[in-house]
Amino acid sequence: MGIELLKQEHYRIFDQTSLGNTFHATQSFAMDDTLCASVATEGAAIRSWVHHETVVLGIQDARLPHLDDGIDVLHAHGFQPVIRNSGGLAVVLDAGVLNISLVLPERGGIDIDSGYEAMLALVRRMFAEETDAINAGEVVGSYCPGSYDLSIAGKKFAGISQRRVRGGVAVQIYLCVNGSGSARAQLVRDFYAAALQGETTKFVYPTVVPETMASLEELLQRPLTVEDCLVRVYRSLMELGATLTPSVLSEVENERFGVNLGRMLDRNEKVLG
């Protein structure tokens, strides 16, 4: 089912990988909600995005007993926190992490596993020439662990999540393309250590083991860039028969984006001040 979901006739393309430091993660989450709401009429979309020195926190992270101390750790390393509008836990974003959102219409219903399988199929096609060893399954010791962690030889390089809004589904992945996967994990480990301070909580936060994470460049032992990976995304979709059209939001979508961004900013203001 996953590969079949990828076989859309047409994709709108939104490339937001080179917008720099002025492009804030709150804008990204508002963007995906906007595309989900219009996908039934405007068609499937693929959005790529990069954020610099950002740690995206989940709803449970916002309930950490010493959150302010954890945020101080992030600031000390030059990172800014953002609260996402869905579940999941802390994830590190920087210039070496490519994020991809696959936005599909829920015509006939898309079950949760099918959405994950579609993204897994895409990533496997992207790197089919380099490896056939990309596995899906929780990597214990990684940050934001889940059943659709992607790994090679037991080391996680990507995680997949989903967001469903108004008849559309956004399947989102972060791909650690280059840089040190273990250094990113060390940052998250330090964040949780400061935010928990040894306290027992009702929710069990991950015990991060930095050695469980790596970048694709480290795992494949060849130079990789975000730009190279983005070309692989587009090529893989075109090989499946899709036409790709660089796009911008319509007037209606722009208005909706403004509303969605306002909600994201309000959410972050309440938690982070």
Curated annotation (Swiss-Prot):
Pathway: Protein modification; protein lipoylation via endogenous pathway; protein N(6)-(lipoyl)lysine from octanoyl-[acyl-carrier-protein]. This is Octanoyl-[GcvH]:protein N-octanoyltransferase. It comes from Exiguobacterium sibiricum (strain DSM 17290 / CCUG 55495 / CIP 109462 / JCM 13490 / 255-15). Gene3D superfamilies: Bira Bifunctional Protein, Domain 2. The keyword Chaperone does not apply. Belongs to the octanoyltransferase LipL family. The keyword Lipid metabolism does not apply. The reaction proceeds via a thioester-linked acyl-enzyme intermediate. PANTHER family: OCTANOYL-[GCVH]:PROTEIN N-OCTANOYLTRANSFERASE (PTHR43679:SF2), OCTANOYLTRANSFERASE LIPM-RELATED (PTHR43679). The record marks K156 as: Lowers pKa of active site Cys. Its EC number is 2.3.1.204. Keywords: Acyltransferase, Transferase. One of its GO terms (molecular function) is lipoyl(octanoyl) transferase activity. CDD domains: LplA (cd16443). It catalyses: N(6)-octanoyl-L-lysyl-[glycine-cleavage complex H protein] + L-lysyl-[lipoyl-carrier protein] = N(6)-octanoyl-L-lysyl-[lipoyl-carrier protein] + L-lysyl-[glycine-cleavage complex H protein]. The active site is at C144 (acyl-thioester intermediate). Catalyzes the amidotransfer (transamidation) of the octanoyl moiety from octanoyl-GcvH to the lipoyl domain of the E2 subunit of lipoate-dependent enzymes.
